[in-house]
Design a protein with these regions (language model features):
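Alpha-solenoid helical repeat scaffolds
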Residues: 225, 256-261, 293-294
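Short, solvent-exposed beta-strand/turn patches at coil↔beta or beta↔helix junctions
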Residues: 38-52, 287-321, 339-346
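Periplasmic peptidoglycan-binding/anchoring modules of Gram-negative envelope and division proteins
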Residues: 52-71, 303-336, 361-365, 403-417
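Periplasmic OmpA-like peptidoglycan-binding domain that tethers envelope proteins to the cell wall
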Residues: 87-103, 273, 306-309, 338-417
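A short, hydrophobic beta-strand-centered structural micro-motif
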Residues: 60-61, 75-80, 106, 113-155, ...
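N-terminal segment of the mature soluble domain
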Residues: 69-122, 161, 366, 371
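C-terminal/domain-edge helix-coil "capping" segments
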Residues: 24-72, 157-249
Length: 417
């Protein structure tokens, strides 16, 4: 099956003549000026230990805050910090929040820390947002992730402007990027406008800029999402489900975290039918954005799912739902396998392709109408999302299988090449 896919020199002429009437012409020119030397890029910032890096960013954030016109006491809420690529909360981002809260209470008494809730947001507080992102410190694309970028921002929701920024680089030693339970358990990763707007508001702004409008429009829903995540992480699955269902009814509530939350809470409550109905909506959301990444975990070096039944138990139901939703849309899919960077690139390329083939075959077994509408490809480790090479829960997305909407063509057997 085929898929549609100098310097300008300035010359001065001088004419002279002699009494004998013999004319002589002389021409002189200024030498061509060499082009100005290209300024060398500034050296990358020097990463420092995590504690020092966070303290620098946080102190810069609060000491430089533009509080002109603000009351003597400023209400501050923290919209939970996230990974700047995956959007996940983690042990590291939770630690950042704890350290920042303690710093504010001890050193910046003008700021009064309040809970992130719909009631507090209604009072137009100052909101602290932040991202924590693994990066190559020299900015080399595909280079080793040898630092973490800390980005903090204060958004005044009264004026809808950014009133301060704080940034720094941290060494990776001692940092625990293990995702919080909700994000660790979430089966699906897809492009999500709400998470993108949060990241843009932190990373894509400077002091004085307006808060991203999509972030401002969804901040009430974000507070509900946070309530749901906290309830899920605490094991209060019934409470989490109630919150997510309420969020779905709120403007801007149809977002990936909410849909994942409805699925996860129902699954934990052993409400299988409701869980799979919710998973179908997760699949629809991902396919609508043209790409859906599912965390299928395989045995090392194998095309077979891992043996841990507690993890792989829902895999068959996921495959059934992906096949059902794809068949119903009468569309075509590219099934793309990915690996982390561990191992030889050639082996990773082959293994990721074989895993994609396996998933493709399973989908076609579920829905015969998909035969001729799927193609399997392997990307190896060339499109890692996290890229830290830890090979644990923190970079599980690097070992994902993606379903990418593709135009339908004719012919071919759909095998990877």
């Amino acid at each position: 099956m085929n898929f549609a896919q100098g310097s300008l020199g300035l010359f001065l002429c001088i004419i002279t003549s002699s009494f004998a009437g013999v004319a002589a012409e002389a021409q002189t020119s200024t030498p061509a000026q060499p082009p100005p030397a290209t300024a060398a890029p500034p050296p990358p910032p020097t990463p420092v230990p995590f504690d020092a890096a966070l303290l620098k960013a946080a102190n810069d954030l609060f000491t430089k805050a533009n509080l002109n016109g603000a009351p003597d006491k400023v209400t501050l809420v923290i919209d939970p910090l996230i990974d700047g690529v995956t959007g996940a909360q983690s042990k590291a981002t939770h630690l950042e929040e704890q350290r920042i809260t303690a710093l504010v209470k001890s050193n910046y008494p003008r700021f009064q820390v309040a809970r992130f809730s719909a009631e507090t947001i209604a009072k137009a507080p100052v909101v602290l947002i932040g991202t924590f992102t693994a990066a190559n410190n020299a900015g080399v694309a595909g280079g080793a992730k040898d630092a973490y970028r800390i980005c903090l921002a204060l958004a005044d929701m009264r004026t809808k402007t950014i009133i301060s920024k704080g940034v720094s680089r941290a060494l990776p030693e001692g940092i625990d990027p293990t995702p919080a339970a909700f994000f660790n358990d979430s089966p699906v990763f897809a492009k999500d406008a709400s998470t993108d707007s949060y990241i843009k508001t932190c990373q894509g702004t400077k002091v004085g800029d307006n808060v991203d409008q999509a972030y401002a429009d969804r901040i009430v829903v974000a507070s509900l999402v946070n309530d749901g995540i906290e309830a899920y992480d605490d094991g209060r699955y019934r409470d989490a489900l109630d919150v997510y269902q309420s969020a779905l009814k709120t403007p801007g509530g149809e977002q990936l975290r909410v849909l994942n939350g409805v699925y996860l809470a129902n699954y934990k409550l052993h409400r299988t039918n409701a869980a799979m109905e919710a998973f179908g909506k997760v699949v629809d959301y991902g396919l609508k954005s043209d790409k859906l990444a599912v965390k299928f975990l395989f045995k090392p070096g194998s095309t077979q799912f891992i043996t841990d039944r507690s993890i792989r138990a829902p895999y068959n139901a996921w495959l059934e739902k992906v096949a059902e939703r794809t068949a119903a849309k009468q569309g075509c899919l590219e099934v793309v396998g990915h690996t982390s960077a561990t191992g030889l690139p050639a082996i990773n390329d082959r293994l990721s392709g074989l895993r994609a083939d396996y998933i493709k075959d399973r989908l076609e077994d579920e829905q015969r109408s998909l035969r001729g509408r799927l193609i399997a490809t392997g990307k190896g480790s060339r499109e890692m999302i996290v890229g830290t090479g830890k090979d644990d829960a923190s970079d599980a997305l690097d070992r994902r299988v993606e379903f990418k909407v593709a135009p339908c063509g004719g012919g071919g057997n759909g095998r990877s090449t």
